[in-house]
Structure formats: structure tokens, C-alpha cells
């Protein structure tokens, strides 16, 4: 009985910890319209978070759209499958990931990135900024 309780407690603790990470699948929500825009998968490798667009969810979205305004290796790449988050790393002692970039495929611009899981990891505050000017979207966890 004690072993069962211990296993359940450890499993619950692991689940709670795992949710306070940006890693997972998220619905990006337009901060201006409240509309669900896309499904984004965030992964972590070598301590850095990356994110790709897995599904375009906006009504009437062009599933064959390309990032014509992007630069470098993302120039003219399909938006579906496009890596829009690169290089965010966890800040020591905090549930915050910074130091990376987020791409807005609608204008091809990269912004300084901050990711902050909130509400027990059910939501993710995604802040993109240039200098002191920026905006925050709240994404909703899918899985």
C-alpha cells in the first residue's frame, strides 16, 4: 500500500513539473482578435526550445502559404512546418525561457522571445519584443 501511494505521489509530482515547461503542443491565439491561429509544437534539444507550426487553424488559412517576407533559411519556405521559435533557454531558478527569437511569418520579422508557463502550465505567455516595445500572446496547451 505504501509503495502504491509513493508511486502515485511521484507520478503526480512528475506530471506537475512537466507542465511548467513550454515543451508541448499549443494553440496560438491572436492577441487582437482572440482567434485560434495555429497549432505549434515546442520541443527542447540541448537546453534550447524550438517551435514549429504543425497546423494552420485560422478560418480560410492558405495551407500552401509561404513565408515570402522571411530572410535566410526560412525565405519562401512553407508556413506549415516552419520553425518560428529558436534558441530560448530556461532562466536559472525561474519558470521562464529567454534568449531566443520568435518569427512572425506574416511579416517575416524576428523578435526577442520570452516564454512563461502560467496557470499550472495550461497556458503559455509568449512575448515578442524589439527593445522595450513588444506584445504578448497567451497560448493554450493542447498536450
Say what each PLM segment does.
Residues 19-25, 93-100, 122-125:
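Short, hydrophobic/aromatic-rich segments at coil-to-beta transitions
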Residues 45, 118-120:
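Structural motif
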Residues 52, 125-127:
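Beta-strand residues in well-ordered beta-sheet regions across diverse protein folds
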